[in-house]
């Protein structure tokens, strides 16, 4: 089941998927009650074995300049809605004797990114929430892990490049090139590569992996 706020985009995404049985659920993650109602309709049709949390990032800017409302909005969209989704799918996972929860966050949980103050803050909170869940849910056979994408070719990265270009006088293409050169592999990541890491953590091969932060960043993060 694909879960997002835009029904047309969800339907278009389903058409690109192979196989049958794909469904959509529509909810606005700025409205937690929307999320609760939508996920209830999903679990009513059967248990959820795998939950992937992947919410778009908040607007950029320095941490000290952000309004408190921006922090509250980010925590609502990320942590609060993630919590509601977990609470909704947990009974089915426990009844099945296990499950997988994967949160797509950011390498900023290991190394804060300049100009993304609110995002850095909320991503760190989600990472600690997930680690806590891994400890709590392990006895139920449920693994909880985080995937940390680096500079990956997405609309979000284009947005960040355009914002930085407007401030520095560079072109967005020049900004993206500089980002790629800062990666040891000297290129940007692809969404499919992040998807591969998620698929691995949801596979039987990762049954004994829980509570980790897995960077998918071409080696850019400097910490161990």
Task: Please state what every model-predicted region is.
Residues 111, 198-199, 210-224:
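Short C-terminal tail/terminal secondary-structure segment
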Residues 102-126, 130-139, 151-152:
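Catalytic loop of short-chain dehydrogenase/reductase
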Residues 91, 135-136, 207:
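Alpha-helical segment proximal to the catalytic Tyr-Lys
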Residues 138, 143, 209-211:
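Short, small/polar-rich loop/turn modules that mediate ligand/substrate recognition or access, typified
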């Amino acid at each position: 089941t694909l879960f997002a706020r835009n029904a047309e985009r969800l339907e278009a995404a389903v058409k690109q998927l192979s196989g049958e049985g794909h469904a959509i659920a529509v909810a606005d993650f700025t409205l937690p009650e929307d999320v609760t109602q939508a996920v209830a309709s999903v679990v009513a049709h059967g248990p959820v074995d795998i939950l992937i949390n992947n919410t778009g990032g908040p607007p950029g800017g320095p941490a000290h300049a952000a309004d408190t409302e921006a922090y509250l909005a980010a925590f609502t969209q990320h942590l609060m809605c993630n919590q509601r989704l977990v609470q909704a799918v947990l009974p089915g996972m426990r009844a099945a004797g296990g499950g997988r929860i994967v949160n797509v966050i950011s390498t900023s949980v290991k190394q804060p990114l300049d100009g993304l103050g609110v995002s850095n803050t909320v991503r760190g909170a989600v990472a600690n929430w997930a680690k806590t869940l891994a400890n709590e849910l392990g006895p139920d056979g449920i693994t909880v892990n985080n995937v940390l994408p680096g500079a990956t070719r997405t609309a979000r990265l284009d947005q960040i490049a355009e914002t930085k270009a407007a401030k520095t006088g560079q072109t967005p293409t020049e900004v993206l090139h500089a980002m790629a050169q800062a990666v040891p592999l000297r290129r940007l990541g692809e969404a499919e590569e992040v998807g591969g890491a998620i698929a691995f953590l949801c596979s039987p091969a990762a049954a004994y992996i829980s509570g980790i932060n897995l960077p998918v960043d071409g080696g850019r993060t400097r910490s161990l």
